[in-house]
Amino acid sequence: MAQQIELTNTVKDSQLGQRLDQAIAELFADFSRSRLKEWLLDGKVTVDGNVVTKPRTKVMGGEVITVLAELEDEVRWEAQDIPLDIVYEDDDILVINKPRDFVVHPGAGTPDGTVLNALLFHCPEVAEVPRAGIVHRLDKDTTGLMVVAKTVPAQTRLVRALQKRNITREYEAIAIGRMTAGGKVDKPIGRHATKRTLMAVSPMGKPAVTHFRVAEHFREHTRIRLRLETGRTHQIRVHMSYLQHPLLGDAAYGGRARIPAGASEDVTAMIRNFDRQALHAVMLRFEHPITGEEMEFHAPVPDDMVELTETLRRDAQEHGLPDEY
């Protein structure tokens, strides 16, 4: 069944001179460029109340853009009885704690067995919501908290809150190398020039900002806490790799095993055998899209990262930390 949707956002001053089709792609990032352009050409987009159908129209900043359209489901995904770790649920939203090895959305190579398929089984009503209510994603092997909308109004408002950076997402990670201080990475992220499944810091990419602080030192690794301002694909993994502190276990972005000198066999085995990026979405805070209530959720660090952390901590206690700490 087609869903009537209404999207509204304001053009940022930083978008001055952008083409309208480029501007709406940034403002309504939850929808594909091709779908947004189709709506634009069909007269479904207004700028300050006036219908505009020319993609090359320039924006100046400050305009209110509204999209009024019908959303047809492109594909009817299968509902599958896959367990979900539900942290919170009401009539409008669902918060889950995603385990490792769990893809969020069907795609090339993963036609089913995803979070989306599980959502369709658990709450069939999300079949009438774009993307089954998925507001943001976690990578396949990243664990932790995700919020899902169960209705179109809830999703529209959550997506808008995400675009306005009003949803707080914090992560815990183990980075390779000795990090002595926290900071901020403000570097745009785009598709990797040659490895098309990966992302990279790129001047042609989209704005991306990650804040981080040191939580605990180990001999050759650092436990860190991170907060996202933006939500680009692989953002934390790319930014930490850019800082030359890739996440332990993240082979795609340079997280090769680094063994501390004189490490025991147990420590060596733990580091070498940790086979996913050591990254967990530990905290999620946002305003409820319908009631306006401030909501905050926490997910305990999963067992594999707890064991990794305890192993690195014992190693540091046995051998002592480097003088630079």
From Swiss-Prot:
Enzyme class per UniProt: isomerase
Catalyzed chemical reaction(s): uridine(1911/1915/1917) in 23S rRNA = pseudouridine(1911/1915/1917) in 23S rRNA
Stored SMART domains: S4 (SM00363)
Gene3D superfamilies: Pseudouridine synthase, RNA-binding S4 domain
Cellular component GO terms held in the UniProt record: cytoplasm
Family: Belongs to the pseudouridine synthase RluA family.
Protein name: Ribosomal large subunit pseudouridine synthase D
Species: Vibrio vulnificus (strain CMCP6)
Organism taxonomic ancestry: Bacteria, Pseudomonadati, Pseudomonadota, Gammaproteobacteria, Vibrionales
Chain's gene name: rluD
